[in-house]
Structure formats: structure tokens, C-alpha cells
């Protein structure tokens, strides 16, 4: 029986294609209800226009085509070809009836080209190609190829790119040496040295000193090369693994590639278990093929990883050695090095840690004093004690920083004093006389303050003990206004009737305050007394540390009850023609208080009673504080810190809140 390869020895491509066209014309004119059928392994496939089509015989070349029959379940796999005016199954196309076709035979006839197409495009790609293998392209009509025939059947092939032939990947470049491009052997014939036979035939067919094998090596090529070097150890420099067209930088010896693959296979065998055998093919060929396939897959993956690592290492090394040009950069735009910048940041953070903490607490206390308006004397002075205590805790560490805010607040206070003096208006003869008297008193106070300033300037600020001794001056100087505040509160609403008495009383208060100066200086001797007074009677006016330092440098008379003034301004809002803004961050001088006393206030009897009760409660509580302070002087500073009368302060706060009058409208002092 003749097979297509035997029948098409003298047939041309045009004759084959014309025969297929005639068949398609008959199929179009045929009866669709009674189609022709093709029998294949007990399966009958109906032949219709829906499952018949032309396919290119040489891949990308569309000029030569053959007619193929596709299975209904797979429209991409041909099950038969129309050759020599009839349909032939795939298994019959690769057979021959000529006994002379044995071994490797070079492809020359159209029938042999059809056999090569079936082996490559249908049997290998659709039936026997492994997942890790790369499919071969369809051979062209001029490719050098040989088919291996065994007992009347084609079992494999190999193809070669001769020297000087055009590379499909590089259209303008030609191969520098003969390259074994493809090699295929059917699975049931593997393990019988057919691969070695094809490699030996390739070496014998070309006489060049260097022969190439296409990268990457398939499992069949790997096995064949290993057997070849075992049989011919003197040909180690003959075979090269080639990429591209085979320039000197695109090739490595195959022996080195085999060593690399052997190491990878050994590593994979130690780390990964072997895959189970399928048993689908022959028992002798399947185990060897499976092992070789696994080795080839791992070797290809590892080759890719190694190439990527080498490229990355070379790139990173080049970057490390390359120096960045700084010619176009100016000196002020250069950034410090990372290590230097890190050290500087650590040094600056450790150096400014204490300053940041103290400045944060002082700023918070000052902002709180500036943002809150004090409605009454007795309630607000205790609400401000907590930020004031935090400010005094940092007094020992930051006496120099406290002096700067004090110096800044002095010109602000002088500015306010000047503004308020410009707003004075003559009410009557008596009021002008009182203002003259108060101006004389303020001159005396200014002289006293100058003496105190000279004494304070002589004291260095670098001693924490000296800066702490300034606290008793503020603490004791704030006590007489608190004691005298109840006397002034009920007299202020009746200022038109009792103005002379208020002025004389104020002079008496100033004399008492001046007489207290020797006693204050006497308390500066011991640091324990200073700690005691600073813990118990610290800043009844509720000012932060910066304001306390200012009090120590200003005259004692300027500490006269600013809270009383603000509360009186709230109560007497109806009698004031212009809006007045209350200054809670800075103390008011006695001259400002006289101005407010000159303004007529209106107050009902209920408010008088409430103010009297507040003054009584505050006087009682201050007496208790005075007694506790005298007891504390005899004891140590540690015991005094435990005996801080926190409960009494809370009671006083509750009393002050309970005696608040009705809601009052607040006026800003200009």
C-alpha cells in the first residue's frame, strides 16, 4: 500500500493545491443533509464546510497551503489532510512503503515536507510537547532538515541553520556557524540512542571547526550531548551553545553548560521530590524521559535566574563605582551626608529637649492666661494655680529664659500705662486732687522699684538658688492686696461719696507694703523657707513663671489686685462709655485702679452682699494660708510638700463659684 510520502514524490505544490480547490467546490455543491464521513479509530467525522479549511504548509509563508480536516471538539487540531485526491489520517501520513527509507534522510520532496510539517506542527506541538519546552517554528521550504525513519515510519527529525543563512530574529544578520536549530524524537523511541545518532550525523555533515546548538538546550539535546562527550571526549571544544546568530560573545562551550545543568539537577534532587511517573508510554522510555524533562525544566529556570542575577550584580557594581558629578551644584545647595545629618539631628534633639519642654509649658500657661477672662478675684486666682505651679517647677532650670519674657512684658505694661494715662478725663476738682495724690504715690513706688531693680541686677542669674529666692517677694507682696481687697470692693460702687477715704486708705496700703520689704528680705536667707512659700502661697494672682519674674523686678505696688479691677469693670459696665479690654496676662498699676475708681459704677444691694460674702470668704481662707505658712517655716521642705492644703483651695473655689452673681456682660479694656 502506498502512502502519501511515496505518492507525492513527483507532485508540485500547485497540483496539490488545485486538487484541494476542486474538492472544496464539490463540497459546496454537495447535499448538506447527506455529508461525506471520514472514519478514524472507530470514530466517524462528518465532512462539511464548517470543519474543513486550508492551512499554510510553511508557517508564515501563505503561498503554499494544504486542505485539513478538523475534529468537531477541537477546531485547531487537524486529524486528516487532503493529499493525492483523498483524506489521509495523521498516523498514515508519517508512514512509507519504500524499504529504502531507513535512517536519517534529508528532506527534498513535497511528500517529505508534508511529513516534516506533520511531525513538527501536529505530533510534537499537539501531542508530545512538554510544558517547559518551547515549540518549534514551522520549517520553511528551503530549510536544511533530515527525517529519521525507522521500520517504515518517521520517528524524528532535526533541522540546521547553515552558515550564512538569514536569522529569522535578526533580519539583517546571518549565522556565523552551523547551528542545530530543532531536534525531535517521538517518546516511544527515546532511550535508544536515536538522539546521539542524530547529533553524530549533524557533526559529520558539517566540517566547520565550531558547531552550534540552539539555546536553550532541550532535554533531548542535553541527553544527546552528554552521550556524545562520553563517547568522544576529544570534541569538547567543538560544540557550542549559541544564542542569536552565534557571535563570539553569544556562545559558550557545551561542556560548561552541561556542568551547570548537572549542579542544578543535583540541587533540585535534594530539595524537591521526584514527580510520579504517568505510565502512559513505554516503561523503559518514560522514567528516563521524565527525569530528563524535570532536569531540563529546572535548568532552564535556573539559567534565567542566574542571568538576571549577573546582570543586576554588574549594574549595581557599576553604580557603586560611578561618582556623582557635583560641578554644577553650589555650596549652599549641597545636602549633608546621611550619617552627619543623623548625628546632628540626634545632638540637636538631645540638646534642645529641656528647652522644648520648658518653653512648651510656659507658652501653654501664658496662652491660657491671655485667652481666659477672669470674672471674679476669688475664683480665677485658684483656677490658674496649676499652670503657675508647672511654670515655677522650671524656674530653677531656666532663670535666664524667664528674665527675657519679663523684660518683654515691661515695655508692654508701660505702653498700656501710657495709653490709660492719655484716657484720663477730669471729672471734678476732687477727682483731680485724688489723681495728683495717686501720682505722688506712684512716684514713691517707682523710686522703691528702682532700688529693687538695682539690688536684683547685682544678683547673678546663673545660680538656681538665687532665682528661687525671688519667689517669696512675689508671694508675700501679693498677700496685702488680697487682705485689703474686701475693704475696697464694697467702697467702689459708692466712689462718688467715699473717694477721699479710698485714696487715704490706698496710701495706707502703700505704706504697709513698703514696710513689708524688710521682712521679705529676711525670708531670703534659707532655701527651705523659699520652697515652703513657693509650694503653699505661690502666686495667688495665678500668673506663670515669666510673670512672677517680672513681679520680682517691678515695684510692689504694681501687684495690687488686677483681678479686683477686672471684676469691678465687669460690674460697672453700664457707667463706662467706651469698651474696655481686660488684660489678664500683665498686672495693672495703682494708677489704672484710680482711674477705674473715678468712673461712677452702679451696683444694686444684692451685688454688694455677694461681694461682701466673697471678701469674707477670701479673707478667712487667706488667714488659714498664713497660719499654715508660718507652721511650714519651722518644718522641712519635704514635710511641707506633703501638707499642701489642696482641700482648702478646692473649698475656696467652690465658695467662690457659689457666690458668683448673675451673668455679667464683659467689656474689653482699651
Swiss-Prot record:
Biased composition range(s): Polar residues: 358-375, 460-470, 558-569, 579-591
Species this protein is from: Homo sapiens (Human)
Keywords (A to Z) from UniProt: Membrane, Nucleus, Phosphoprotein
Keyword Membrane: yes
Modified positions (Phosphoserine) in chain numbering: 350, 379, 449, 515, 615, 618, 635
GO cellular component: nuclear inner membrane
Keyword Phosphoprotein: yes
Protein name in UniProt: Soluble lamin-associated protein of 75 kDa
Record region (Disordered): 273-301, 314-670
Amino acid at each position: 500500500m502506498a502512502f502519501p510520502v511515496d505518492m507525492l514524490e513527483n507532485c508540485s505544490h500547485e497540483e496539490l493545491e488545485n486538487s484541494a480547490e476542486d474538492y472544496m467546490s464539490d463540497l459546496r455543491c454537495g447535499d448538506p443533509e447527506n455529508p461525506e464521513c471520514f472514519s478514524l479509530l472507530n470514530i466517524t467525522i462528518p465532512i462539511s464546510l464548517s470543519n474543513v479549511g486550508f492551512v499554510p504548509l510553511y508557517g508564515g509563508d501563505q503561498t503554499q497551503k494544504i486542505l485539513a480536516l478538523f475534529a468537531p471538539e477541537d477546531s485547531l487540531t487537524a486529524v486528516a489532510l487532503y493529499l493525492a485526491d483523498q483524506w489521509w489520517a495523521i498516523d498514515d501520513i508519517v508512514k512509507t512503503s519504500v524499504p529504502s527509507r531507513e535512517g536519517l534522510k534529508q528532506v527534498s520532496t513535497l511528500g517529505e515536507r508534508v511529513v516534516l510539517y506533520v511531525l513538527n506542527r501536529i505530533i510534537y506541538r499537539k501531542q508530545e510537547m512538554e510544558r517547559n519546552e518551547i515549540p518549534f517554528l514551522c520549517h520553511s521550504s528551503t530549510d536544511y532538515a533530515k527525517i529519521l525513519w525507522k521500520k517504515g515510519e518517521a520517528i524524528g527529525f532535526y533541522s540546521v541553520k547553515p552558515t550564512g543563512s538569514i536569522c529569522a530574529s535578526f533580519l539583517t544578520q546571518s549565522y556565523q556557524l552551523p547551528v542545530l536549530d530543532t531536534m525531535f524524537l517521538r517518546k516511544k523511541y527515546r532511550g535508544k540512542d536515536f538522539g546521539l545518532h542524530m547529533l553524530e550525523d549533524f557533526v559529520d555533515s558539517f566540517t566547520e571547526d565550531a558547531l552550534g546548538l540552539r539555546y536553550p538546550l532541550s532535554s533531548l539535546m542535553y541527553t544527546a550531548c552528554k552521550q556524545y562527550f562520553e563517547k568522544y571526549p576529544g570534541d569538547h571544544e567543538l560544540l557550542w551553545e549559541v544564542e542569536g546568530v552565534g557571535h563570539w560573545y553569544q556562545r559558550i562551550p557545551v561542556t560548561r553548560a552541561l556542568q551547570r545543568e548537572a549542579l542544578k539537577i543535583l540541587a533540585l534532587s535534594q530539595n524537591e521530590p521526584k514527580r510520579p511517573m504517568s505510565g502512559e508510554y513505554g516503561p523503559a522510555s518514560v522514567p528516563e524521559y521524565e527525569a530528563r524533562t524535570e532536569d531540563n525544566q529546572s535548568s532552564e529556570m535556573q539559567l534565567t535566574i542566574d542571568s538576571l542575577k549577573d546582570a543586576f550584580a554588574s549594574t549595581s557594581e557599576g553604580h557603586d563605582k560611578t561618582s556623582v558629578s557635583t560641578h554644577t551644584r553650589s555650596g549652599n545647595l549641597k545636602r549633608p551626608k546621611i550619617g552627619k545629618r543623623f548625628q546632628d539631628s540626634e545632638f540637636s534633639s538631645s540638646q534642645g529637649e529641656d528647652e522644648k519642654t520648658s518653653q512648651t509649658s510656659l507658652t501653654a500657661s501664658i496662652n491660657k492666661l491671655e485667652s481666659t477672662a477672669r470674672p471674679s478675684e476669688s475664683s480665677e486666682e485658684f483656677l490658674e494655680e496649676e499652670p503657675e505651679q508647672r511654670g515655677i517647677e522650671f524656674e530653677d532650670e531656666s532663670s535666664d529664659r524667664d528674665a527675657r519674657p519679663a523684660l518683654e512684658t515691661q515695655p508692654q505694661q508701660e505702653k498700656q500705662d501710657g495709653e490709660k494715662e492719655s484716657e484720663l478725663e477730669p471729672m471734678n476738682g476732687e477727682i483731680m486732687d485724688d489723681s495728683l495724690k495717686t501720682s505722688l504715690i506712684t512716684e514713691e513706688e517707682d523710686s522703691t522699684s528702682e532700688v529693687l531693680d538695682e539690688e536684683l541686677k547685682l544678683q547673678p542669674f546663673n545660680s538656681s538658688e538665687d532665682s528661687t529666692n525671688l519667689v517669696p517677694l512675689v508671694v508675700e507682696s501679693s498677700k496685702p492686696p488680697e487682705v485689703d481687697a474686701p475693704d475696697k470692693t464694697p467702697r467702689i460702687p459708692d466712689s462718688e461719696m467715699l473717694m477721699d477715704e479710698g485714696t487715704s486708705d490706698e496710701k495706707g496700703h502703700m505704706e504697709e507694703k513698703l514696710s513689708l520689704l524688710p521682712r521679705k528680705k529676711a525670708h531670703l536667707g534659707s532655701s527651705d523657707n523659699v520652697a515652703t512659700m513657693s509650694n503653699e502661697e505661690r502666686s495667688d494672682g495665678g500668673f506663670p513663671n515669666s510673670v512672677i519674674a517680672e513681679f520680682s523686678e517691678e515695684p510692689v505696688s504694681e501687684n495690687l489686685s488686677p483681678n479686683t479691677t477686672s471684676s469691678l469693670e465687669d460690674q460697672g459696665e453700664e457707667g463706662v462709655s467706651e469698651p474696655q479690654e481686660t488684660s489678664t496676662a500683665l498686672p495693672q498699676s495703682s494708677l489704672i485702679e484710680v482711674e477705674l475708681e473715678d468712673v461712677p459704677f452702679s451696683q444694686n444691694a444684692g451685688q454688694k452682699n455677694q461681694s461682701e460674702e466673697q471678701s469674707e470668704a477670701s479673707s478667712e481662707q487667706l488667714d488659714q494660708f498664713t497660719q499654715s505658712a508660718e507652721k511650714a517655716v519651722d518644718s522641712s521642705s519635704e514635710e511641707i510638700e506633703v501638707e499642701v492644703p489642696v482641700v482648702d483651695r478646692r473649698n475656696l473655689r467652690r465658695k467662690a463659684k457659689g457666690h458668683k452673681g448673675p451673668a455679667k456682660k464683659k467689656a474689653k479694656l482699651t
